[in-house]
């Protein structure tokens, strides 16, 4: 990460992100230019839908030239954040971020509901780009007992701190030592595949961002290092693309 400073006098401000920060000192050093990423000419999936190919082509065309503005907003096109941005700027973000979290079986069993797919279809038909992440809950049987900050553990069941690591190990699941855990995760994937299929049937291409922020370790999919996470990522691709036919 770097900060571009113009020649002459500059003012650098440090602001809080999550409401707190720890700071010992600041060092300013010259850094070399970052290597520009070169996007592959073609998608990995040779059978990608026409809509997916058009979106990929557009993103390649604007890469390094323009910035695509986006906003996560559960309410979609007419949600609180989008209304605030439109009021302040007169413009609507080009990209809407949503979450498959509330479609996860563990959360559904605890009474959670979602209309994220409907919001995505609405936004796409209005001409926008849709991206999804997935805060993937582990099933209740893998959660610690008690509560987390007064909330039931399942409410934050994607956080490593809420998972009983003596019962759940992604490493064991991915190396074949825990077939029951593997089948359980695949059942979750099946449910999310149904939602992706709904989007595919509506001709809505999605920038899907599963297993996000894995390097931090605060989510269970990144808590045991890169190797099991990479295996799970590849498995997700194989299942969603080759088994469920989502292109």
What is each of the regions a protein language model found here?
Residues 1-52:
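Extracytoplasmic
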Residues 4, 10, 82, 87, ...:
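Surface-exposed substrate-engagement region within the catalytic domains
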Residues 9, 23, 93-97, 127-131, ...:
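Extracellular structured ligand-interaction cores
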Residues 18-20, 33, 74, 101-103, ...:
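Short, solvent-exposed loop/turn segments at secondary-structure junctions
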Residues 31-87, 92-95, 99:
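Boundary/entry segment of secreted carbohydrate-active catalytic domains
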Residues 98, 110-111:
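The feature represents the first ordered module of a protein
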Residues 106, 112-242, 246:
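Substrate-binding cleft of extracellular glycoside hydrolase catalytic domains
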């Amino acid at each position: 990460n770097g900060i571009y400073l113009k020649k002459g006098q500059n003012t650098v401000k440090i602001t809080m992100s999550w409401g707190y920060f720890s700071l010992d000192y600041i060092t300013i050093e010259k850094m070399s230019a970052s290597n520009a990423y070169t996007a592959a000419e073609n998608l990995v999936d040779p059978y990608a839908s026409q809509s997916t190919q058009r979106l990929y082509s557009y993103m390649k065309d604007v890469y390094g030239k323009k910035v695509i503005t986006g906003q996560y907003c559960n309410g979609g096109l007419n949600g609180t954040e989008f209304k605030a941005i439109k009021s302040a700027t007169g413009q609507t973000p080009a990209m809407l971020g949503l979450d498959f979290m509330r479609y996860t079986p563990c959360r559904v069993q605890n009474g959670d509901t979602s209309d994220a797919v409907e919001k995505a279809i609405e936004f796409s038909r209005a001409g926008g780009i849709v991206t999804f992440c997935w805060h993937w809950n582990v099933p209740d049987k893998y959660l610690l007992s008690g509560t987390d900050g007064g909330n039931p553990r399942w409410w934050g069941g994607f956080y490593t701190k809420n998972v009983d690591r003596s019962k759940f190990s992604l490493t064991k699941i991915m190396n074949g030592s825990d077939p029951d855990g593997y089948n359980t995760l695949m059942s979750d994937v099946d449910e999310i595949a149904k939602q992706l299929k709904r989007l595919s049937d509506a001709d809505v291409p999605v920038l899907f961002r599963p297993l996000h922020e894995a390097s931090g370790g605060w989510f269970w999919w990144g808590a045991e290092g890169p190797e099991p996470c990479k295996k799970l990522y590849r498995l997700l691709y194989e299942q969603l693309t080759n088994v469920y036919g989502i292109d």
